[in-house]
Amino acid sequence: MRFQIKDLLHISLLSTGIFLFVIDLFIINVSLPTIQHSLQLGNSDTQWIIILYIIGYASLLINAGNAGNHFGKKKLYLIGMAGFTLASLVCGLSTNLYMLLAGRLIQGISSGLMVPQGIALITLLFENKEKKAMALGIYGSIAGIASVIGQLLGGILPDQTWINESWRLIFLINVPIGSLACLAVYRYTPKDQVSGESPRSFMPMVTLFILLMGNIFPLIMGPELQWPLWSLLLLVTAIVLFILFIRKQRALEKMGYPSLLNFSLFNNRVFNLGLLAALAYYMVQDAYFIINSNYLQNQKHYSATMTGIAFVYQGIGYVLASIVVSKLIQRHGKTVVLFGLGIMILGLLSHLIVFNTMLLDPHQVHALFFFYGIGCGSVLPALMTLALKDLPEKLVAVGSAIYLTVQQLSICLGIAFIVGVFLHQKETTFFFWQDISSAYGYATTLSVILLLCVASLITCLPSEKIK
């Protein structure tokens, strides 16, 4: 069954949201060292540039579906796209850290509005099951391609010489894309029907955002400030308040009032194990890019462009593996995921061997990143399927939103813990690796331990095949 030109136009326009979100999630990883040098930022400042983007996005995910039903999916998609475009302009014109952080937070919040509505509009536009499946496949492919493009542009754009402070291009490039997409969606995408569903209060999401910031803030600032007493008190207080908040939401659900979460989901053992596996895995995922980008540029004297190209090989390995694994998983189930985790662990240990020299061979680096990408591509696409596969159909949408929220928050924890270890560890050699810094060695070791935890959780899942 073929798509008409107008079908491809709709898919392209409604995939622009996820394209821009993923681009800006990955483009920043390679360009962070350049931004840090240009704006004279501290180590914790660079962590906030990523974390505020992710928390802003995650804070709206759970309520996004309900908001789209009440206010209109097209309307929220346009508001999110416009907000993302304006925030990108703010980031590109930033003259100080606080202006950049404000822009990144608004980028994240805007993404939380537009990304869920984009995929919801695609499912509404294509009633035919075969066309819908093909459209969602294209949507997913665009997100995967965006991650590779983001890494490449994050390396190439900061090295441009025809403009001063060329790192600004990584944000300014979004402005024409977002502006054209807004106009085209307004003109060509049909308006969806608004349901009579009552809007949920956004206060629980605001409360959740504040509590998460209360947990993340001391984890980021504590190591840099030598853990003053206030940071420890804030962390303990935030954890206690977070537990009380969850208990309050559970009590509301039992009384029949709207709740932030559907707690019946957590009666499913497979879902719980899948969430824990995702929590550990995604702590490693984004931290890997940030650490290796920083290490290659600041310790091994790679340019941003060379670093971006190296990460393209990781992306190619990921894409190729994910295509092959989608077929193998149906026959071999969780064994494929465990095999992928083994490749990732072996890849991380190989980093310590290959990087143990002052003069890196680019071909070895490319092969190493490609190998690690194969491991990622064997694991990541199946994790969500593993977590959701035993849920009743009526709970899959809610379970997906919770899974995606945990995914984003796990990335924040990875940046706080693993990247924090890398940035704040004193520079000495790592045991008998004379040309590996202790910071890189300990961060890599922590990543390996977390991946071993993922493998342990996966082995606890039932052995039936994934459908």
Predicted segment positions?
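12-transmembrane solute porter fold
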Residues: L9-I23, I28-V30, G256-T428, S438-E464
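Extracellular/periplasmic helix-loop-helix junction of adjacent transmembrane segments
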Residues: S31-S59, M99
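Interfacial helix-cap and linker-helix signal at transmembrane-aqueous boundaries
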Residues: I35-Q36, A67-G68, L153-W162, L219, ...
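Helix-breaking motifs and short loop linkers at transmembrane-helix boundaries and internal kinks
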Residues: S38-Q40, G72, L93-M99, H301, ...
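Central cavity-lining transmembrane alpha-helices of secondary-active solute carriers
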Residues: I51-G65, G112-A120, V312-V324
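Helix-to-loop junctions at the C-terminal end of transmembrane segments
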Residues: L61-G72, P158, A321-T335
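Helix-loop-helix hairpins in multi-pass membrane proteins, especially solute transporters
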Residues: K74-M203
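Hydrophobic transmembrane-helix bundles of small-molecule transporters
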Residues: Q160-L276, I309-A310
